[in-house]
Amino acid sequence: YKMNKYNTNHTFAVCAYKESPYLEECIRSLKAQTVQTNIGIYTSTPNDHIQSIADRYDVPVYVNPDAGKGIQADWNFAYNSADTDYVTVAHQDDTYEPGYVETLLSSVKRYEDWSMYYTDYTPIKDGDSSRRDVNSRIRRFLRWPVKNTAKADSIRRKKLSLCMGNTIVCPLVTYNKGRLGDTVFTSEYNFNLDWDTFYKLAC
């Protein structure tokens, strides 16, 4: 496989575990992007299920040679292995709207010093993603400090948007690896390590 088929400077690094029934739907949503981009599957649990889906959609699979060290190590393996400046660490049970990459590439052109890009989300329930649940509403409300784009680069505002909990959904984040370097996940936590990462980046 040639890792970078597209010159978007972006990769969807899909973290796959065991035999998820949602992995194929996730990959389909990435293949359906209005701007085609690079996709790779990264796993510590290689199996026929993952490989068959990868073969079906012509997506390369990368196996973590240092498996068994936890989710943070798996995320860093996927992030570090992606050979582009922009990396979205996608989770196997999430899907993306077709315009995610197009909007990303358009948005980041306006900011030379960006480190992290993220979007809103809605949960999928019984195949329906048109309705917000309570968690989605609360998270959206708590992000109010950074809704004013003219002031969103304020450290105080970024920290304020995270001080009541994790208001950002991890799979919808794209990291500017060209700015952040390797191994972006350095949390000492076993849980909420994504929130800890976002808070560190906010500082």
Language-model regions: role of each:
Residues H91-T95, D120:
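The conserved acidic donor/metal-binding loop of glycosyltransferases
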Residues G99-I138:
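Conserved donor NDP-sugar-binding/catalytic core segment of glycosyltransferases
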Residues R28-T37:
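Short, acidic, metal-binding catalytic loop of nucleotide-sugar glycosyltransferases
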Residues V87:
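Short aromatic/hydrophobic "clamp" motif used to bind/position activated sugar donors
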Residues Y42-Q51:
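A conserved acidic beta->alpha catalytic loop
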Residues Y1-S29:
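N-proximal low-complexity "stem/linker" segments adjacent to membrane-targeting elements
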